[in-house]
Structure formats: structure tokens, C-alpha cells
Amino acid sequence: MSKRLRVEDDFNPVYPYGYARNQNIPFLTPPFVSSDGFQNFPPGVLSLKLADPIAIANGNVSLKMGGGLTLQEGTGNLTVNTEPPLQLTNNRIGIALDAPFDVIGGKLTLLAGHGLSIITEETSPLPGLVNTLVVLTGKGLGTDTTDNGGSIRVRVGEGGGLSFNEAGDLVAFNKKEDMRTLWTTPDPSPNCKIIEDKDSKLTLILTKCGSQILGSVSLLVVKGKFSNINNTTNPNEADKQITVKLLFDANGVLKQGSTMDSSYWNYRSDNSNLSQPYKKAVGFMPSKTAYPKQTKPTNKEISQAKNKIVSNVYLGGKIDQPCVIIISFNEEADSDYSIVFYFKWYKTYENVQFDSSSFNFSYIAQE
């Protein structure tokens, strides 16, 4: 007759024997099971210890996969999805390269040919240009910054005779903006004050020809005593001469105090003048080296006559009505540069309008 063994009501036949199910047991794995990769969870159940990206999916050990990874059916291989220019080569991810890109020193770089360069700290101290691709420019070329970004430009020197026309073409002569000619226009309105305002009109054209200035001048008096010369009733010396002074500052700009109104004097634009007053015309001024201001007492080594041009014009264009013309350079003390026209006659004219013939002259330019 068998005898039934009496056991306690909370006896647990699952290892470890004799412990209640709800008891907190610090270590439950049998001695023949390693704790590496395994765990007792829930208590009393041997399970795998998982860490990302390993997971259990539908009772199977699985791998968590984000975007860009694919598990191939059949082979079970894990592959990487690529989009050009990325590619898989020999089980490695790479970049499909085409000119002008290359890999140098394990880094993606740009192959810069002639005329291009990548600025580094060693080649430029300007922080705004470091690590940027720039165009290398030589003589005659430069770069500009515009609202649309940088651009390459042709460098045109001031006073060099080159400019851009309205179409953007580089031209040696631009009649719309002729910086080689300063003038009053070919037929100006009355622009001078000999005795009273706007009583005469001076036609003056100065054209730069290298180191020389070619000039043309004529004077017509439209009102006042010189519009009808009568030396019988006006025989005084002052009634037989007219002076036209052009005074210029250090930039070659016509100053107040000149006989001519500065609003009539500018660079050429077709048969008129530029709309904006000019700011610099030193290249048209008489050379201070060739025509220095006169010193007192006079220096015998400096010519006292070189700064003058003396000749004749003819009133009304008639050879029997001569008038002496004297052009002096840089004689006026209250200006940096000056050109003065003296008209003087020695005959006694009666009822003759002062209307001089044109006179051409030249002088050495300041620069």
C-alpha cells in the first residue's frame, strides 16, 4: 500500500523547487545555462535578452529595419537600397563620379582646370572666400558682385578711350558716352558772360589724343557793345579786347568765376552733353610740367612764352578783319588749372559783330 507524501500547499514543482511563484528570486537560471544572452523573464521563464535592433516578431527573432534597408526573399540577405549617385560596388557603398568630381585623399573634391581655383586659408586671408570656387582673372579682367551674384567684367581704365555701348559691346569710340571729348556742343546756346549774362556763346571742343589735347574754339557775341563793335565812338583799349577765362579745380572741373557757365560744359553724348555733370577730367588739363605757373622774379631757365599760343582769327571770317588770339595755360593764381582766351584787335572797326572764325590749337595734357 503506497503512502502519499504530504507537501505544502504552495510547493512549486518547477525549478527552483520549494519557492513560491510570487517570491522575488534574484537568480533563477539553472547552473547549466549561461546568463549571457538569456534572462528569467517573466519570473520562472527562460527567454532571450534582446537589444536593438533585435526584436521578436510573430514569435520569431527578427531585425528592426529602418528606411534604406531591404531583406531579400529567398536568400534572407540584408541589402541597402541606393539612389543615384550612390551605388553598391563590391559590397561597399560608393558615389558614382563623373567629371569634374574626383576622390582625393579619401575626400570628394572638385577638379578645377585652368582659370578656376578653390580658395583655402593658405591662398587667401579673406574669410568670405575660404573654401569657395573662384574664377582666376588676369590683366584686363575682374569680378563684380551684383544682385544676381558674381560676374566677370572687363576692366576699362578711366580715360583710356574704351567703353561699353548701349548693347553692352566694348568699343573704342562710344558716341553716346564719349569720354575723349569735353565740349560745349557744336552749336551751344549763349553760355558766357563777357559784360552781361548770356551775352555770348563760346564754342569749344577739347579732344584727348594721347598726351596731346586737340582743341577748336570760336566766339560769337550776341548782345552788348561787342555784338556791334564801333571803335569810332568807343576807341578805348578796353573796347578792343575780350577775355574768356576757364578756371578748373584739381579734378579738372570747371569752377565758378569762369566766364562760361559750367552747365554747358561736359563730356560728349552724340551732339549734346551727358546729362550728369562730370566729376573728373584731369587728363584734359594743361600739363603743370609743361606750363608751370609763372614765378616772380622770373626764372630765366623757365620759358615765359611757352605757355602761350599766339595767332590770328578773323571777324566774320573776312581776311581784312583780323583779330589776335592769345591762349594762355595755367597763368591764373586762383585755380589749379586754367585756359584763358584773349581776343584783341588793333584796327578800328565800325558796325562789326564780334564773330570769330574757328581756331584750332593743341597743348600738352596733364596725364
From Swiss-Prot:
Q: Which SUPFAM superfamilies match?
A: Fibre shaft of virus attachment proteins, Virus attachment protein globular domain
Q: Where in the cell is it found?
A: Virion; Host nucleus
Q: Does the keyword Kinase apply?
A: no
Against Pfam families, the record matches this protein to: Adeno_knob (PF00541)
Q: Which InterPro entries match?
A: Adeno_fibre, Adeno_fibre_knob, Adenovirus_pIV-like_att, Attachment_protein_shaft_sf
A GO BP entry: symbiont entry into host cell
List the induction conditions: Expressed in the late phase of the viral replicative cycle.
Assigned protein family: Belongs to the adenoviridae fiber family.
Q: How does it assemble?
A: Homotrimer. Interacts with host receptor CXCAR. Interacts (via N-terminal tail region) with pentons.
Return the protein name.
Fiber protein
What is the source species?
A: Human adenovirus D serotype 15
